[in-house]
Amino acid sequence: MNLILMGLPGAGKGTQAEQIVAKYNIPHISTGDMFRAAMKAETEMGLQAKSFIDKGALVPDEVTIGIVRERLSQEDCVRGFLLDGFPRTVAQASALEEIMKDLGKKIDYVLNINVDSGLLLKRLTGRRICKECGATYHLEFNAPAKADVCDKCGGELYQRSDDNEETVANRLDVNIKQTKPLLDFYEELGYLQSINGEQDINKVFADIDVLIGGLA
């Protein structure tokens, strides 16, 4: 099963990725991990990426796409994979189609975890972190026993500056605009599957499981 996982910040992608790879024993391939592994292994594309990163420059698409090709050609991807964080643009998605064709494979589903932006705002702005031990809480979903006090060490809880409402709303807005052309591209190809991410975590996975179970 060859899957792409999409969703806005706060949609719960990480949690669902963990459950998918645990049940179906396929590699979870995130962009960051892919780059780190390629640079560590000193592959041709990894060395090229490192030369750009060391200069503080953006890694060009052709290098990123080369790293994706290297990674998807590895033995652990024979039974499938879960791609997370790539592609980000229609150009990258088109390049991925070419890679899959060359490898004699196809993308089975693009799973988009769908959550209303108002609910995402609530999820993302409710996070609080302990100044002393770094424990993470959420005002609605995982509140401390005593307001603004860490259950573990009694430290003061604070909101990170990039978790404030205006910053989060801007971040979501940018993500929505960037993601829409990609979702349209995959809908046209017939790969896109919308998953209701507003449900309980286990129910979200149950819906994904029903969808992809037949691919195993």
Curated annotation (Swiss-Prot):
Residues 30-59 are annotated as: NMP. Its EC number is 2.7.4.3. Pfam families: ADK (PF00406), ADK_lid (PF05191). Residues 126-163 are annotated as: LID. Zn(2+) binds at residues 130, 133, 150, 153. Pathway: Purine metabolism; AMP biosynthesis via salvage pathway; AMP from ADP: step 1/1. AMP binds at residues 31, 36, 57-59, 85-88, 92, 160, 171. It is an enzyme of class 2 (transferase). One of its GO terms (cellular component) is cytoplasm. Keywords: ATP-binding, Cytoplasm, Kinase, Metal-binding, Nucleotide biosynthesis, Nucleotide-binding, Transferase, Zinc. One of its GO terms (biological process) is AMP salvage. InterPro entries: Adenyl_kin_sub, Adenylat/UMP-CMP_kin, Adenylat_kinase_CS, Adenylate_kinase_lid-dom, P-loop_NTPase. ATP binds at residues 10-15, 127, 136-137, 199. Transmembrane segments: none annotated. It is found in: Cytoplasm. One of its GO terms (molecular function) is ATP binding. It catalyses: AMP + ATP = 2 ADP. Monomer. Consists of three domains, a large central CORE domain and two small peripheral domains, NMPbind and LID, which undergo movements during catalysis. The LID domain closes over the site of phosphoryl transfer upon ATP binding. Assembling and dissambling the active center during each catalytic cycle provides an effective means to prevent ATP hydrolysis. Some bacteria have evolved a zinc-coordinating structure that stabilizes the LID domain. Catalyzes the reversible transfer of the terminal phosphate group between ATP and AMP. Plays an important role in cellular energy homeostasis and in adenine nucleotide metabolism. Belongs to the adenylate kinase family. This is Adenylate kinase.
